[in-house]
């Protein structure tokens, strides 16, 4: 009986600790995909429109047209 009570109290304490730490970290961590794009944009420079793009070259500022293998700017709205 005592062991059961000790186990129940331990589980409740561990659950409470997890809830407290999860609440404290809210807003600190960014979404995984946003972090990776900001790291890439800070660490590499992009290729201008008209430059050759392929699997071994740097990233285009816009996007890479795979059929023509040239960097193209995003269309403006």
UniProtKB/Swiss-Prot annotation:
Its main location: secreted. Expressed by the venom duct. PROSITE patterns: OMEGA_CONOTOXIN. Keywords: Calcium channel impairing toxin, Disulfide bond, Ion channel impairing toxin, Knottin, Neurotoxin, Presynaptic neurotoxin, Secreted, Signal, Toxin, Voltage-gated calcium channel impairing toxin. It holds the Pfam family Conotoxin. The keyword Transcription regulation does not apply. The keyword Signal applies. One of its GO terms (cellular component) is extracellular region. Transmembrane segments: none annotated. Residues 1-22 form the signal peptide. Belongs to the conotoxin O1 superfamily. The presence of a 'disulfide through disulfide knot' structurally defines this protein as a knottin. The cysteine framework is VI/VII (C-C-CC-C-C). Omega-conotoxins act at presynaptic membranes, they bind and block voltage-gated calcium channels (Cav). This is Omega-conotoxin-like 6. The lineage of its organism: Eukaryota, Metazoa, Spiralia, Lophotrochozoa, Mollusca.
């Amino acid at each position: 009986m005592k062991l059961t009570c000790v186990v129940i109290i331990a589980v409740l304490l561990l659950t409470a600790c997890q809830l407290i730490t999860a609440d404290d970290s809210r807003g600190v961590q960014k979404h995984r995909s946003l972090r990776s794009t900001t790291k890439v944009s800070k660490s590499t420079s992009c290729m201008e429109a008209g430059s050759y793009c392929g699997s071994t070259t740097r990233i285009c500022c816009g996007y890479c047209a795979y059929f023509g293998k040239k960097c193209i700017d995003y269309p403006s709205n």
